[in-house]
Design a protein with these regions (language model features):
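C-terminal substrate-binding subdomain of Rossmann-fold SDR/epimerase-dehydratase oxidoreductases
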Residues: 7, 32, 60-63, 208-344
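Short, solvent-exposed loop/helix junctions and linker helices
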Residues: 9, 91, 99-102, 160-164, ...
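Residues at alpha-helix boundaries and the short loops/turns that link adjacent helices
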Residues: 41, 65, 84, 194, ...
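Residues in well-ordered alpha-helical elements
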Residues: 66-69, 88, 95, 106, ...
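Non-catalytic, surface-exposed connector residues within folded enzymatic/regulatory domains
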Residues: 91, 122, 181-184, 198, ...
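Structural element of the ATP-grasp superfamily
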Residues: 108, 171, 204, 297-298
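NAD(P)-dependent short-chain dehydrogenase/reductase
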Residues: 132-147, 159, 169-241, 254-256, ...
C-alpha cells in the first residue's frame, strides 16, 4: 500500500488494537482512524501510549451509516475487524451478532463501494465448522481436505460463526456484483496481549494469577490452531499490499494443540501442577477441531509467521498479563460470575 489514511473498525478490541500497534510501529507514514463501539470487548486502554498524530479513536457503531460514511470518505482503505465474537454469548442472545456482524458489514461495504476504496474483511475459520481429530483421519490431519482451505465449504455451527459466514458472503457478493475492491482473511484462534479475559488462554492465566482454579470445558480434547496476534497483523497487512481483489486468504501458524495440552502448558509455565484444574460442563455445540492450511497465503504472498513455536509466544503472553494486572483485575470477578452461572 502507498502512504494513506486507513480506517480500522474494532481497533480498540484485542486483534484490532494489536493491528493498530503493528501499523504504528512498522509503517510510520500511515495514519489510523479507529472506529469502535467500545462494548465490553473494546477498551480505550488497548490504544494507550499511541501518538495522537498517528491514531484517532472515534467511538461509534459500524451499523451507523452516517458515522461510517463520514469516516470512509476520509480513508483510502477500510480494515474491518469489528465483530461480536464470543460463542457463549451468541448462544444466549444472537441479536447483537446479527446486527453487528451482518448489518455492520453491510454498512461498511456500501460505504467502501460508494467511495471506491480498498476493503479488507477479517473473518474466522469457524465459518467452516469443525474437523475430525487427526487420529480419526486417513492422512492424520495432513491429507486433502483434512485442514481448512480457502474453498472449504461453509458449515457454521453457532450463531456467532453463522453471522460471520453471512458477512463473508456479503463481501464476496459485493465484489462480484459491484466491483468492490475487497479481500477476505479467515484466521485460526488468536492469542497475545490485550485479549479479553473471557477467552480461553487469558482466562486460565488470570485465574491462576487470581488464585482461582482453572476450568476446562468437557474432556479438553477440542483442538485449536493457535496464531499469535502479531502474526495475524502482519498477515493482514501483507494481504492489503499484495492480495488479489476477490480472493480469500487463510492465516495460520501450524499451531494445532488440544485445549488440555495448552492448559497444562500454562500451568507448567506458571509454576503450578499440571493437574491443578477442574473439568466443567462443555459448551453446547463445541467444535471439535480447527486447522488452517495457509499454503496459498505463504506461497502467493510470501507471508510467514514469526511465532512458529507456540510456547515462546505463550510465555510472552503470560508475562504480559502478569505485568499488566491493572488492565484486567477490575473485570475478573464479573467475568467469572457469568461463567459460574453456567457451571463453567
Amino acid at each position: 500500500m502507498t502512504s494513506a489514511p486507513i480506517l480500522v473498525t474494532g481497533g480498540a478490541g484485542f486483534i484490532g488494537a494489536n493491528f493498530v500497534r503493528y501499523v504504528v510501529d512498522e509503517h510510520p507514514d500511515v495514519f489510523v482512524t479507529v472506529l469502535d463501539k467500545l462494548t465490553y470487548a473494546g477498551n480505550e486502554a488497548n490504544l494507550s501510549g499511541l501518538p495522537e498524530d498517528r491514531v484517532k479513536l472515534v467511538v461509534g457503531d459500524i451499523a451507523d451509516a452516517a458515522i461510517v460514511d463520514t469516516l470512509a470518505k476520509e480513508a483510502d482503505a477500510i480494515i474491518h475487524y469489528a465483530a461480536e465474537s464470543h460463542n457463549d454469548n451468541s448462544l444466549k442472545d444472537p441479536s447483537p451478532f446479527v446486527i453487528t456482524n451482518i448489518m455492520g458489514t453491510y454498512t461498511l461495504i456500501e460505504a467502501a463501494r460508494k467511495y471506491d476504496i480498498r476493503f479488507h474483511h477479517v473473518s474466522t475459520d469457524e465459518v467452516y465448522g469443525d474437523l475430525p481429530l487427526r487420529e480419526d483421519l486417513p492422512g492424520h490431519g495432513e491429507g486433502e481436505g483434512e485442514k481448512f482451505m480457502p474453498m472449504t465449504r461453509y458449515n457454521p455451527s453457532s450463531p456467532y460463526s453463522s453471522t460471520k459466514a453471512g458477512s463473508d458472503l456479503l463481501v464476496r457478493a459485493w465484489v462480484r456484483s459491484f466491483g468492490l475492491k475487497a479481500t477476505i482473511s479467515n484466521t485460526s484462534n488468536n492469542y497475545g496481549p490485550y485479549q479479553h479475559i473471557e477467552k480461553f488462554i487469558p482466562r486460565q492465566v488470570t485465574n491462576i494469577l487470581s488464585d482461582i482454579k482453572p476450568k476446562l470445558y468437557g474432556s479438553g480434547k477440542n483442538v485449536r490452531d493457535w496464531i499469535h496476534t502479531y502474526d495475524h497483523a502482519t498477515g493482514v497487512w501483507t494481504i492489503l499490499e499484495k492480495g488479489c481483489i476477490g480472493e480469500t486468504y487463510l492465516l495460520g501458524a501450524d499451531g494445532e494443540l488440544d485445549n488440555l495440552t495448552v492448559l497444562k502448558m500454562i500451568l507448567r509455565d506458571m509454576g503450578r501442577s499440571e493437574d491443578d484444574f477442574d473439568f466443567v460442563q462443555d459448551r453446547a455445540g463445541h467444535d471439535l477441531r480447527y486447522a488452517i492450511d495457509a499454503t496459498k497465503t505463504r506461497e502467493e504472498l510470501g507471508w510467514k509467521p514469526k511465532y512458529t513455536d507456540f510456547e515462546t509466544g505463550l510465555k510472552d503472553t503470560i508475562k504480559w498479563y502478569e505485568d499488566n494486572r491493572e488492565w484486567w483485575q477490575q473485570e475478573k470477578v464479573e467475568v467469572e460470575a457469568k461463567y459460574a452461572q453456567n457451571n463453567q
